[in-house]
């Protein structure tokens, strides 16, 4: 059965246009949501913590900038787009004391609601609007008259308006131009975390590093190893994004395609799939989130230790040197770039 997909013709933009929306956070997604909502005729204010470096950017863009608490008190709909690990504290300290009956609290990701780290009162609508693309793409597509597909969900709906309100919001940021897919907080959260951990971040990251180690330990030059197991990955991913795995195989040489069919299952075999299932179980039963919370409460020490270990891997030095040769590659970690 085809998944339900909603478009502009299904949405009532006047619903969100009749609300005051506070965007908490002015990062990649916060900036895009705020700009698109404003361009769609919605009254928007930005909520930021005292001393935030984003205040000047938001003010230069012409937004009313308030503290998180002031924004929560002012708004009818509050979209919490701060980092996952900061959201519970922001909610407890700034948002919860200022919520009123009938307010709506929205999220761009379901983690804090699904795992009970944030528990709004029963008279608050809890919704999610999650564009499936980075903020700069959400904004650029909107300006071009297009949009990025969005997921929407409602976890708590005391007034029976959650679906219409989230759909209206999604339409206002351009999502309904491309397609809006209703889901649940549970499904969005668990699939998102699994994708990040088993494939997109954890899986690919360690596949690259292990491939680099195999080649260099066999005596090949680090530069050659980097080109073959890391640099060319973007070419492959772009082909998959554009037309699926079939398109990638079609676009590769017969040698690469044949070798991939033979060796892929040797590297990613049934035992890997079983361990991926273990990762999913840890997500579903809350094991991962408990460790995430413990890390935050411990001052991010475990995260910093893990980050330092990966950042010291030899592939990082090799990659940095080679990227200096590539005029078309911009290093986002280089503030002068």
Swiss-Prot record:
Pathway: Amino-acid biosynthesis; L-isoleucine biosynthesis; L-isoleucine from 2-oxobutanoate: step 2/4; Amino-acid biosynthesis; L-valine biosynthesis; L-valine from pyruvate: step 2/4. Gene3D superfamilies: 6.10.240.10, NAD(P)-binding Rossmann-like Domain. Its cofactor is Mg(2+). InterPro entries: 6-PGluconate_DH-like_C_sf, KARI, KARI_C, KARI_N, KARI_prok, NAD(P)-bd_dom_sf. Residues 184-329 form the KARI C-terminal knotted domain. One of its GO terms (molecular function) is magnesium ion binding. The keyword Metal-binding applies. Residues 1-183 form the KARI N-terminal Rossmann domain. Mg(2+) 2 binds at residues 192, 228, 232. NADP(+) binds at residues 26-29, 49, 52, 54, 84-87, 135. Mg(2+) 1 binds at residues 192, 196. Keywords: Amino-acid biosynthesis, Branched-chain amino acid biosynthesis, Magnesium, Metal-binding, NADP, Oxidoreductase. Its EC number is 1.1.1.86. It is an enzyme of class 1 (oxidoreductase). GO terms for biological process: isoleucine biosynthetic process; L-valine biosynthetic process. It catalyses: (2R)-2,3-dihydroxy-3-methylbutanoate + NADP(+) = (2S)-2-acetolactate + NADPH + H(+); (2R,3R)-2,3-dihydroxy-3-methylpentanoate + NADP(+) = (S)-2-ethyl-2-hydroxy-3-oxobutanoate + NADPH + H(+). It comes from the Bacteria. The active site is at residue 109. Substrate binds at residue 253. Binds 2 magnesium ions per subunit. GO terms for cellular component: cytosol. Belongs to the ketol-acid reductoisomerase family. Involved in the biosynthesis of branched-chain amino acids (BCAA). Catalyzes an alkyl-migration followed by a ketol-acid reduction of (S)-2-acetolactate (S2AL) to yield (R)-2,3-dihydroxy-isovalerate. In the isomerase reaction, S2AL is rearranged via a Mg-dependent methyl migration to produce 3-hydroxy-3-methyl-2-ketobutyrate (HMKB). In the reductase reaction, this 2-ketoacid undergoes a metal-dependent reduction by NADPH to yield (R)-2,3-dihydroxy-isovalerate. This is Ketol-acid reductoisomerase (NADP(+)).
């Amino acid at each position: 059965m085809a998944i339900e997909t909603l478009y502009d013709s299904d949405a009532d933009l006047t619903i969100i246009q009749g609300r005051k929306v506070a965007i908490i956070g002015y990062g990649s997604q916060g900036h895009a949501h705020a700009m698109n909502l404003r361009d769609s005729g919605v009254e928007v204010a930005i909520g930021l913590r005292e001393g935030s470096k984003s205040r000047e950017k938001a003010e230069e863009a012409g937004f009313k900038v308030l503290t998180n608490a002031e924004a929560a008190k002012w708004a009818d709909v509050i979209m919490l787009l701060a980092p996952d690990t900061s959201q519970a504290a922001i909610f407890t300290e700034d948002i919860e004391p200022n919520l009123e009956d009938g307010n709506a609290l929205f999220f761009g990701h379901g983690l804090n609601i699904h795992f009970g780290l944030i528990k709004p009162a029963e008279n608050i609508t809890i919704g999610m609007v999650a564009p499936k693309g980075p903020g700069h793409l959400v904004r650029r597509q909107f300006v071009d008259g297009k949009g990025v597909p969005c997921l929407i969900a409602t976890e708590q709906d005391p007034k029976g308006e959650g679906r219409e309100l989230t759909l209206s919001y999604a339409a206002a940021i351009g999502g309904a131009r491309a397609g809006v897919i209703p889901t649940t907080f549970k499904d969005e959260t668990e699939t998102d975390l699994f994708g990040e951990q088993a494939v997109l971040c954890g899986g690919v990251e360690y596949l690259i590093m292990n491939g680099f180690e195999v080649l260099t330990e066999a005596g090949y030059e680090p530069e050659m190893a980097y080109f073959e197991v890391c640099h060319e990955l973007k070419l492959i991913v772009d082909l998959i994004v554009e037309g699926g795995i079939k398109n990638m195989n079609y676009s590769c040489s017969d040698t690469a395609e044949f070798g991939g069919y033979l060796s892929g299952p040797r590297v990613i075999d049934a035992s890997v799939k079983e361990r991926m299932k273990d990762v999913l179980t840890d997500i579903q039963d809350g094991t991962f989130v408990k460790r995430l919370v413990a890390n935050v409460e411990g001052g991010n020490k475990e995260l910093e230790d893990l980050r330092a270990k990966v950042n010291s891997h030899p592939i990082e030095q090799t990659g940095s040197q080679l990227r200096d040769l590539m005029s078309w590659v911009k290093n986002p970690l280089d503030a002068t770039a």
